[in-house]
C-alpha cells in the first residue's frame, strides 16, 4: 500500500486543499453555487458536522452536489479504519523477516504464472514505459497479490473516516475531492469503487489523486479499470514509475563486497559515482567488473548493519521508493523482479539473524539515552528513523565501533553502560498458557513450520517446529513455548 507516499504529499495537500476549498469560486460572472447535498444523521453529531461542512466547501469549489450526495450518504465513521491508522506495533520485524516473508515461493510462483498469461501485454508495456516487467510484477504482487487481495472497504468510507478523524484532514479531504472527480468524469463507477482501509484503489493501490494523473486505459475501452483489467493495471504501474523518473536500462541495485577496514560511516545516504566506490575498494559480490557502470551514481546501504549484506543503490531504487517510501519495500520489489526473470531471489551474503533487533520500548530507551548524552536522535518516538540512525552512527564512531548505524541489543547495552545506566540482564522467558500455545501453533503453521493442530497441547511436532524456528531466527534453541518465541513469531509473520 502506498501509505508512505501520503507523507510526501501531505504538506503540499494540506496547504493546497485548505486554500482551494476555503477560497470558493473566483471567476467573474460565475453562476450561483448550487446547494450542497443533505444527509441523514450518521448517529455521530461530530461526523455529521464535518460531512456537512466538507460537502458545502466541495460544492463551492465546483464538485457536483449530486455525486457528492451519492458518495457520502449512508457513510459512517469506521472505527476499524481509525484503529488501523493509529496502531503502533510493539515489535517491528527485522529486515530479514520482512524480506523473507514477502519474497515467498507462493508470490514468485503466482507472479511467474501471471507473466506467462499476459506476457505480450507486459512486453508492450515495458517497451512503452521502459520499466521491466519484473519490476511491475513485483509491485503488483506486493500491493494486492496480483489482484487476489480482498478490498474490504469503499473508498468513500475509508477516506471520510480518515478526514473526519482529523490527524491529516486536508490530505484526505483532497483524496475525497479527487474521488468525486473520478465519478463525475465517468472514469470509475460507484459500484466498482473498492479500496483498502486507507482508501487506496484497485490492484495497484493508487490513491484517488494518483488515479486521476497516472491510471492508464491500456486497451482503449474508454475506462481506466485498475480493479479487473490486467492491461490497465500493468500499464498504470509502468506509467507511475516512468513519470517519476525511471531510467530505462539502468540497474536497481548491486550487491557488493566491502574491503577490510572499510569506513562504514560512508553508508550515510550520499550518492557517489561507482568509480568513486570502486576506488574505495568496493567490488561486485559476483566478481563482475564495473566496466560500463563507472559513471552511475549510487549510495551504500547496509540493511542489517556491518554483519549483513551490503548494497549499492542506484537511481531506479529511489524511483521504486516513490511508490512506497521504504528501502525494505524497494528491495523486495527488486528481488521479486529477479525471480520473475528466473534469477536467484535471495542475496548472496546471508542475513545475520543472530544479532536480533530492538522493539519499540527499547528504541524509545535508546533515543532517550542518546539525546541525554548529546547525540541528537530527534523525537523520542520509538521509531528508528534517519535522526536516530545518525545519532547511533556518531556514538559508534566515538566509541571506535563500526559506524554502521544499526540498532541491536548489544548496542543498547553499550549505550546504557556509557550513560551510567544498569545493563539489562537477559530475562528468563515465561511459559505460555494454553491460549498462547494455540496462537504460537497457528503462527508457526502460517510461517511454514509444521506445528500440528492449534490445540494448545505441546507435543513433539510443536516442539520440533519451535526448535526449527529458533534455529532459523538465531534464538537459543530450547524447544519451549515461551513469550519470547511467540513475540518473535508474531514479528516474523508480519
Model-found features: residue ranges?
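Acidic/His-rich structured neighborhood in mature extracellular/periplasmic domains
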Residues: 93-242, 252-253
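Bacterial N-terminal signal peptides that target proteins for export
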Residues: 2-13
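Short amphipathic alpha-helical segments at helix boundaries and their inter-helical linkers
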Residues: 39-40, 75-92, 144-158, 234, ...
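Surface-exposed patches in mature extracellular/periplasmic domains of secreted proteins
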Residues: 63-72, 132-138, 190-195, 221-225, ...
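Cell-envelope/ECM-targeting effectors and their regulatory/trafficking segments
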Residues: 24-30, 148-151, 163-165, 178-185, ...
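Extracytoplasmic/secreted envelope proteins and their assembly/folding machinery
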Residues: 48-55, 65-72, 119-123, 133-137, ...
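An acidic, Gly/Ser/Thr/Pro-rich helix-cap/linker signature
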Residues: 31-129
Amino acid at each position: 500500500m502506498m501509505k508512505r507516499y501520503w507523507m510526501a504529499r501531505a504538506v503540499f495537500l494540506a496547504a493546497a486543499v485548505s486554500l482551494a476549498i476555503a477560497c470558493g469560486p473566483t471567476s467573474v460572472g460565475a453562476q450561483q453555487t448550487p446547494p450542497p447535498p443533505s444527509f441523514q444523521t450518521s448517529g455521530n453529531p461530530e461526523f455529521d458536522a464535518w460531512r456537512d461542512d466538507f460537502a458545502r466547501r466541495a460544492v463551492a469549489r465546483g464538485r457536483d452536489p449530486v455525486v457528492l450526495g451519492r458518495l457520502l450518504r449512508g457513510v459512517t465513521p469506521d472505527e476499524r479504519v481509525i484503529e488501523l491508522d493509529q496502531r503502533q506495533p510493539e515489535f517491528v520485524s527485522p529486515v530479514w523477516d520482512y524480506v523473507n516473508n514477502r519474497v515467498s515461493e507462493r508470490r514468485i510462483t503466482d507472479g511467474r504464472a501471471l507473466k506467462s498469461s499476459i506476457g505480450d501485454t507486459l512486453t508492450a508495456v515495458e517497451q512503452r514505459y521502459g520499466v521491466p516487467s519484473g519490476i511491475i510484477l513485483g509491485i503488483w504482487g506486493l500491493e494486492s497479490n496480483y489482484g487476489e487481495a480482498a478490498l474490504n472497504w469503499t473508498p468513500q468510507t475509508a477516506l471520510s473516516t480518515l478526514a473526519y478523524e482529523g490527524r491529516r484532514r486536508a490530505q484526505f479531504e483532497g483524496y475525497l475531492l479527487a474521488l468525486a472527480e473520478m465519478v463525475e468524469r465517468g472514469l470509475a463507477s460507484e459500484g466498482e469503487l473498492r479500496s483498502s482501509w486507507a482508501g487506496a484503489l484497485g490492484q495497484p493501490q493508487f490513491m484517488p489523486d494518483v488515479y486521476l494523473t497516472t491510471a492508464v486505459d491500456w486497451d482503449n475501452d474508454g475506462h481506466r479499470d485498475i480493479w479487473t483489467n490486467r492491461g490497465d493495471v500493468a500499464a498504470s504501474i509502468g506509467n507511475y514509475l516512468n513519470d517519476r523518473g525511471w531510467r530505462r536500462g539502468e540497474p536497481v541495485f548491486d550487491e557488493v563486497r566491502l574491503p577490510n577496514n572499510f569506513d562504514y560511516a560512508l553508508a550515510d545516504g550520499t550518492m557517489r559515482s561507482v568509480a568513486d566506490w570502486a576506488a574505495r575498494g568496493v567490488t561486485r559480490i559476483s566478481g563482475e567488473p564495473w566496466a560500463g557502470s563507472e559513471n552511475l551514481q549510487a549510495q551504500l546501504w547496509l540493511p542489517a548493519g556491518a554483519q549483513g549484506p551490503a548494497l549499492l543503490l542506484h537511481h531506479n531504487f529511489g524511483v521504486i521508493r516513490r511508490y512506497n517510501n521504504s528501502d525494505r519495500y524497494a528491495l523486495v520489489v527488486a528481488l521479486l523482479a529477479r525471480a520473475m526473470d528466473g534469477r536467484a531471489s535471495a542475496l548472496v551474503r546471508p542475513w545475520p539473524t543472530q544479532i536480533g533487533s530492538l522493539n519499540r520500548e527499547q528504541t524509545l530507551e535508546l533515543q532517550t539515552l542518546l539525546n541525554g548524552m548529546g547525540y541528537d536522535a530527534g523525537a523520542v518516538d520509538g521509531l528508528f528513523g534517519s535522526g536516530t540512525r545518525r545519532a547511533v552512527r556518531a556514538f559508534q564512531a566515538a566509541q571506535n565501533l563500526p559506524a554502521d548505524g544499526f540498532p541491536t541489543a548489544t548496542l543498547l547495552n553499550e549505550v546504557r553502560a556509557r550513560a551510567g545506566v544498569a545493563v539489562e540482564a537477559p530475562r528468563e522467558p515465561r511459559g505460555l498458557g494454553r491460549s498462547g500455545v494455540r496462537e504460537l501453533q497457528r503462527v508457526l503453521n502460517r510461517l511454514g513450520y509444521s506445528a500440528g493442530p492449534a490445540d494448545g497441547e505441546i507435543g513433539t511436532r510443536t516442539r520440533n517446529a519451535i526448535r526449527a524456528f529458533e534455529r532459523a531466527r538465531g534464538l537459543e534453541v530450547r524447544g519451549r513455548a515461551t513469550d519470547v518465541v511467540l513475540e518473535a513469531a508474531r514479528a516474523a509473520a508480519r
